[in-house]
Amino acid sequence: MASQGTKRSYEQMETGGERQNATEIRASVGRMVGGIGRFYVQMCTELKLNDHEGRLIQNSITIERMVLSAFDERRNKYLEEHPSAGKDPKKTGGPIYRRKDGKWMRELILHDKEEIMRIWRQANNGEDATAGLTHMMIWHSNLNDTTYQRTRALVRAGMDPRMCSLMQGSTLPRRSGAAGAAVKGVGTMVMELIRMIKRGINDRNFWRGENGRRTRIAYERMCNILKGKFQTAAQRAMMDQVRESRNPGNAEIEDLIFLTRSALILRGSVAHKSCLPACVYGLAVASGYDFEKEGYSLVGIDPFKLLQNSQIFSLIRPKENPAHKSQLVWMACHSAAFEDLRVLNFIRGTKVIPRGQLATRGVQIASNENMETIDSSTLELRSRYWAIRTRSGGNTSQQRASAGQISVQPTFSVQRNLPFERATIMAAFTGNTEGRTSDMRTEIIRMMENARSEDVSFQGRGVFELSDEKATNPIVPSFDMSNEGSYFFGDNAEEFDS
């Protein structure tokens, strides 16, 4: 693994920059979100959205999706070459909601992709600003992570649905770059690899010829990304085995599934970033805030402060609970779908409840839903405290690879002990330790068994008052250990179908 010196921070990945100091990073991240904000303001002008309509999260999502679609070169090329009836490859659009005579009306709009690309570049000093595009992809991914379960996808890959906490970023597009790779969970990477190996098993030519060479490079790159997420030598050595396999097949799939299970205790490093909807940045820009001058960070207090004074709305279906809709969006904004609910309760200052008990469906409204009965309400996205986002999975004693917890991938660097029964997890490891990876498997199982409960606690800082911008006085919350802290436990959330 690269030593700390060569590791780029998320913000550098996000902004495609070389090594920068903290001030430069804050400025370039500020430039990125400022560009998103300027673009949003301009789009509202183009579409003649009034202030209230511009603050509607559904309109924000449509506008974000339009610009992402305009810049999706591979798909654009595919659409040009495979024209489908009634679809103009040069246009993009979606539903825009307007307030007419006290009701919300849906209007389907179409815009030239060229025109949207022009507006985006203009808002970003004439550049393509890929970092800003990736940022919006991560926001959509975080929203999906909070809204949907991926049990079906897990089962298809031969994995256990209880591993859903490892699935962060599972809906991110391939083109999301280094910043996207950083936020993908261990389960997500494993699933991508298993899909690839399965294709290789079924299709003899998958690894052959010029295309096969490119496939092989992609396979090894994905293996390296996954290896970099593991923090113990044995897990990494197993990844080397998987990567170097001449002809990846069922043995590799077995190894990968074993590694995924091990990540429930020996947690991987997965980055967390607070990516907000474009309309939030737009509001700040419209009020004259200069992100680049002030600087911005995705992992500190800034997103909390921004949400503290942004009033945005959401459409609400008749049987939905507005407070529950707010919780869903709040969790998505902070990339907290897999965080311990007790930590979220404390930070948000209001009760955060598991997905299965939320009376709300996804944020987006399907085109066949009846608008007559749809109302809107303010999203409550404020918090009581703030905390620093983690990228390590919270294992500070790296060299001893402290253990993690089942069903939670911490988002916030907040100290807590972890609610899980080691016995439950260890039960998943009975059986197969033979084969080429036997010594590594044995070593991993030994580490998991020996994880003492203090190793299993999450070493972190505390939370901070919103007035404490420099994070000088950590408050270490004490948690009631009696209840399980997982959002998706005992759940009936809808499945994500792409």
Swiss-Prot record:
Domain of life: Viruses
Main location: virion
Locations listed in the record: Virion; Host nucleus
InterPro entries noted in UniProt: Flu_NP (IPR002141)
Pfam families registered for this protein in UniProt: Flu_NP
GO cellular component: helical viral capsid; host cell; host cell nucleus; ribonucleoprotein complex; viral nucleocapsid
Region listing for Disordered, in residue ranges: 1-21
Annotated GO MF terms: RNA binding; structural molecule activity
Keyword RNA-binding recorded: yes
Post-translation changes: Late in virus-infected cells, may be cleaved from a 56-kDa protein to a 53-kDa protein by a cellular caspase. This cleavage might be a marker for the onset of apoptosis in infected cells or have a specific function in virus host interaction.
SUPFAM superfamilies in the record: flu NP-like
Motif extent (Bipartite nuclear localization signal): 198-216
Unconventional nuclear localization signal (motif): residue ranges: 1-18
GO biological process, one term: symbiont entry into host cell
Keywords carried by this UniProt record: Capsid protein, Helical capsid protein, Host nucleus, Host-virus interaction, Ribonucleoprotein, RNA-binding, Viral nucleoprotein, Viral penetration into host nucleus, Virion, Virus entry into host cell
Subunit and interaction comment: Homomultimerizes to form the nucleocapsid. May bind host exportin-1/XPO1. Binds to viral genomic RNA. Protein-RNA contacts are mediated by a combination of electrostatic interactions between positively charged residues and the phosphate backbone and planar interactions between aromatic side chains and bases.
Family as reported in the entry's similarity comment: Belongs to the influenza viruses nucleoprotein family.
Function: Encapsidates the negative strand viral RNA, protecting it from nucleases. The encapsidated genomic RNA is termed the ribonucleoprotein (RNP) and serves as template for transcription and replication. The RNP needs to be localized in the host nucleus to start an infectious cycle, but is too large to diffuse through the nuclear pore complex. NP comprises at least 2 nuclear localization signals that are responsible for the active RNP import into the nucleus through cellular importin alpha/beta pathway.
The protein's name in its UniProt record: Nucleoprotein
